[in-house]
Amino acid sequence: MKLDRSAPVDASISCKGRGRRALLLGLSCIGAGLLLPNVALAGAQKEEPLADAVRTALAASIANSAPPKPVFDTTESRLAYLRWLGEMSTRLKKRTADHTTRVEFLETVWYESKRAGLDPSLVLGLIQVESGFRKYAISSVGARGYMQVMPFWARLIGGGDTLALFHMQTNLRFGCVILRHYLDIERGDLFMALGRYNGSRGRPEYPNLVFGARKNWDYQPPAP
């Protein structure tokens, strides 16, 4: 499969702020089916200074148009993607009833994850913890959307339009680019990167919630 990391996304996209676990959150990780209003619980994340070169690179990563349909090198790789899409759609059905909305969401998660060099199961687990898959979730400190992007990211590397963070692809683009940024800062240490994302760097609670939720979205293709 060919995937251009610089490929366009949504022009309104901006980098993502770190997350706050949703109140219904990760209790869904451990099997509790809480369903609360569009409020998410924030971690004590801090806005960090960015070097000009880093800010420029992050801004370039988010400033694209809608993602193209993926192009696969082989029929088998395309079939593998479609099998993944079908399985994830089945798992997500209880949370997102509308088929078209569900498939569009999963296609975008897959694209943005791969574009940022992340595993889709990790991103889905993070979304489960951050917002419980609620598009309009808002934390007590103002983090927004599926991946609980902090508004300051729109100012730092986007066009400043914080309402755009409720746009599905914009939010997912920001979230994936920001998590990738934290992974790079932490030299690939996912535990520490997740802590940065939540504003609780070095503490185990949030990373462990995401690791637990990720298991709900792990996918093993069927044996040939």
Where does each model-flagged region fall?
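N-terminal Lys/Arg-rich, disordered targeting/topogenic segments
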Residues: 1-10
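N-terminal secretory signal peptides and thylakoid transit peptides that target proteins
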Residues: 10-31
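Sec/Tat signal peptide C-region and signal peptidase I cleavage site
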Residues: 36-42
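Cleaved targeting-peptide boundary
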Residues: 42-51
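Catalytic glycan-binding domains that act on GlcNAc-containing polysaccharides
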Residues: 44, 64-224
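Conserved catalytic or metal-liganding residues and their short signature motifs at active sites
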Residues: 59-63
